[in-house]
Amino acid sequence: MASAQWLGLVLALLSSLAASGFPGSPFRLLGKRSLPEGAVNGIEIYSTKINCKVTSRFAHNVVTTRAVNRADTAKEVSFDVELPKTAFITNFTLTIDGVTYPGHVKEKEVAKKQYEKAVSQGKTAGLVKASGRKLEKFTVSVNVAAGSKVTFELTYEELLKRHKGKYEMYLKVQPKQLVKHFEIDAHIFEPQGISMLDAEASFITNDLLGSALTKSFSGKKGHVSFKPSLDQQRSCPTCTDSLLNGDFTITYDVNRESPANIQIVNGYFVHFFAPQGLPVVPKNVVFVIDVSGSMYGRKLEQTKDALLKILEDMREEDHLNFILFSSDVTTWKEHLVQATPENLQEARAFVKSIQDQGSTNLNDGLLRGISMLNTAREEHRVPERSTSIVIMLTDGDANSGESRPEKIQENVRNAIGGKFPLYNLGFGNNLNYNFLESLALENDGFARRIYEDSDANLQLHGFYEEVANPLLTSVEMEYPKNAILDLTQNSYQHFYDGSEIVVAGRLADEDMNSFKADVKGHGALNDLTFTEEVDLKETEAALKEREYIFGNYIERLWAYLTIEQLLEKRKNARGEEKENLTAQALDLSLKYHFVTPLTSMVVTKPEDNEDQTAIADKPGEEQAQAASQTSFSAYRTSYQPPLGSAASYQPPLGTPYYYVDGDPHFIIQVPEQDNAICFNIDEEPGTVLRLIQDPATGLTVNGQIIGDKKSSPDSATRKTYFGKLGIASAHMDLRIEVTTEKISLWNEVGRSTFSWLDTVTVTQDGLSMTINRKKNMVVSFGEGVTFVVILHQVWKNHPIHQDFLGFYVVDSHRMSAWTHGLLGQFFHPFDFKVSDVHPGSEPTKPDATMVVKNRQLTVTRGSQRDYRMDARAGTKVACWFVHNNGEGLIDGVHTDYIVPNLF
């Protein structure tokens, strides 16, 4: 079951100077305005309201902020809202001095063309990016003239999912200044009746919270209002800064007189199912744990802490075993064992003894665990009425044994055969999360990212609590034949205690008098059937009597749930099936105005008397990279101010770097000797060279050579450079093509194209790519692999020279020992000795003898330039130059590195 969804919301309004004033008469005296208390840089946020309407778990949220520019000059106002990753934005409007600029949801490719046109003019800002574990941030900024007012209004919707027996609305509040009218107003309507309602804040004492907070519930209605006065917002009695900086949480649950509840409005129905009081079904759990070398240290210790805590929660009727995989696969016991006190004590000793070693043979580890569960069932080693679960934890990609993701998926799918679920826990960012998610989804489970933080052990244990208490297995939701259309998922492997199954659909005949639903499942003691029958007229009339709820909420809930499930199915679909799923999800997204991974919201806003276009896309899990973010997204963009040269990527101190720039000059830093080696490669324009290839991580970098506009036929005087680079990840099914004009990114969702005129950050699971306008591009694959591409621009009308690229490897410590290529072969430690330094043919460039790789070479002292910090002049780097295309230094000869194309 999916975890409870936190309705997260951060309000952060930031103000900054956007213009330095207005031209006017030299005799005009400008008096300083008296600014209201709490105003920041002349911008007063005088009203912020979060209006939440929750109807039958479906939340409709409107965030409205009003600000005025009290300064004498134009100012830039930014509006930031953090919303749940599970939410869909449905509307955004910007109102300036009474003129409203709305947002429009369009197909992503249609919006992209509008976006790219604006990017080419250097005018755009992407609006949505990931923010932490559960949230993504919506940001928009606008210039506001002196004395003018601006209103921002954002609407988003989501289905709240039950987690550990309650629904949670989690609001992270951060206005960053005193706000005259600040209010959170939440209305909850639940036809089943509300059984409990609570609210608390992390940033304010209970005494102050009590006077600012009102909460009440009676019957079907609940209300929470948080309305602090200016004095209650102050961080101290005489302070002008706000203490509203933290978490505000609303929790509630509903009455459950029967296990199921059906609601019908306007021809759509929703069926909630959450039985209580059932005995727990015994479970058979195999923990498949990655103990490869990358788990060394804190990660492994936190994993062991979590496993010890999980062992405390095991019931005696449960069965368990541990599978450890690195280069090899080992097991704690030959077969599953019962969770008796004696066995649990032995299990604790085993967990404490776990140590890291070797590489990552994920395929064999999983297959061993699956085989063990199958054998236990076949040999009747576990109770007949029990359920099996595989829980796998890994922090990296498979790089030993079978490492092809598609083959691993096939092996696991065939081995499980739909008999039990697989849950995948991805530890950190240096892994292919999309693969783990696809692997889990097609085996009736789900994936969860475990963030590398101090609470990682709590995250692991928290996941286990979600699946610790299965009450039913093989759950089927059945409805009258020919009576329903467009049904969402109605078959589930498990129902877990404290969760809820939600099914929605459309009635084929709205004139029917009654509606009946059966839920069938296997319990701990027997097979169960729960029947719910409702009178359509009575049900619809009862729901419509509440005027304040939005009447089409069940239809929108159905659309939300359908889109969510179509997108999940799409991840493992291929060919025509994937096209059909995409078309269905896109049609619904456009019809119901949802910003999903297939659509974008385009906002046109006024800037300097011109319309500026901005685009909001749905990020993916991705995020997963701590900035990143939702696994559906083709790309994610976030606006950043133009970066100066000082903002270029700076590697950690002591990190060796390798690069190729200029004509093209290859420079290899050898930090152990505080020295560098360099060589040139002379080849015809159009030649593609292999720079990096790592079969373990799946990363490849190739570069294509270009010449001057007017090339010399004489190779001695010919100037060549890199004009195009291809960066690819086989494991992520991702390609990046960099030219001197644009950057193109392909992944499984499609193609995204950006301009060197843009300043933008693009993230998806395992990737972070930042383009700094007209300067450089920084590409990181998780933690430990970072490349920088430098753009060298010349006068476009120069008669000879043209723009070219430099390529720098500033972090390679996660690349494997099998990495090769003209640059990649030097990522591994190597040694050289220089002796017999003597005058060369040029007085300032002495020659010497170098012994490297058991070869003796004649080298010349020279210098090249590092352009990372200064793209124009560069920084001089002294190096020993190896002649003849690096002969004797590189493995083989340079022509061995010529490849047919970029990818």
UniProtKB/Swiss-Prot annotation:
Residues 284-467 form the VWFA domain. It is found in: Secreted. Pfam families: ITI_HC_C, VIT, VWA. InterPro entries: ITI_HC_C, ITIH, VIT, VWF_A, vWFA_dom_sf. Its main location: secreted. GO terms for molecular function: serine-type endopeptidase inhibitor activity. This is Inter-alpha-trypsin inhibitor heavy chain H3. It comes from Oryctolagus cuniculus.
